[in-house]
Amino acid sequence: MKITVVGTGNMGSAFAKQLSSAGHIVRITGREIEKAKVLAAQFENASAFPAAEALGDSDVVVLATAYADAATALQSLGDLTGKVVIDITNPLSADYMSLTIGHVTSASEEIAKAVPQAHVVKAFNTLFAQVLADGPTFSDNQRGSVFVASDSDRAKQTATALAQSLGWKTVNAGGLVNARYLEPLAGLNIYLGYGAGLGTSIAPTWLNK
């Protein structure tokens, strides 16, 4: 796939690494173009662009910014008509220990309102950056899960195919409204990692008997 990654922080860097390793064509952008250039230089199939040029002919946009910056970052890309936007954000408080919105809406639903011409899908939000960068295999050869929620079948299929290309199991989590559940799940994972001291090599998964 041809994929634009928006954000050069820990999650954006982890995506650039894994997408490049899987053979995807990656276009990287962020608030500081120099950071994007440094990141892109580390990987094959990766290039850096200012926001206005970052979309190019990408099929998919991975939104790897803070939630507060999400709408502005997406709108800076230009025309998103028909594009699949994978929202990995969580609406976290400053101390990362709570969510700023929830129950009656979600980060994904608010982002979808901001870019109604795009197909928004929630995915990857329950993974720490370290886990994403290290890949889907855990202890005892267990594979981690990526939960995928969207009102668009195409967006859901695209995010599912992308996650599977990186080696992850996927769970169909229904419509975008279920981001209201996935974001608190990420919040619990963050608490367990930092608040309960379990570290950042953990992730929620879904088991079948």
Question: Model segments located where?
Answer:
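Rossmann-fold NAD(P)-binding glycine/threonine-rich loop
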Residues: 89-137
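Rossmann-like NAD(P)-binding element
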Residues: 40-43, 51-95
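Active-site-lining helix/loop region of Rossmann-like oxidoreductase modules
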Residues: 6, 141-209
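NAD(P)+-binding Rossmann beta1-loop-alpha1 motif at the extreme N-terminus of oxidoreductases
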Residues: 1-38, 42
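General beta-strand structural signal in soluble alpha/beta enzymes
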Residues: 48, 119-123, 171-173
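Rossmann-fold NAD(P)-dependent oxidoreductase module
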Residues: 14, 18, 114, 162
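Short, well-ordered alpha-helix to beta-strand connector turns
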Residues: 23, 57-59, 118
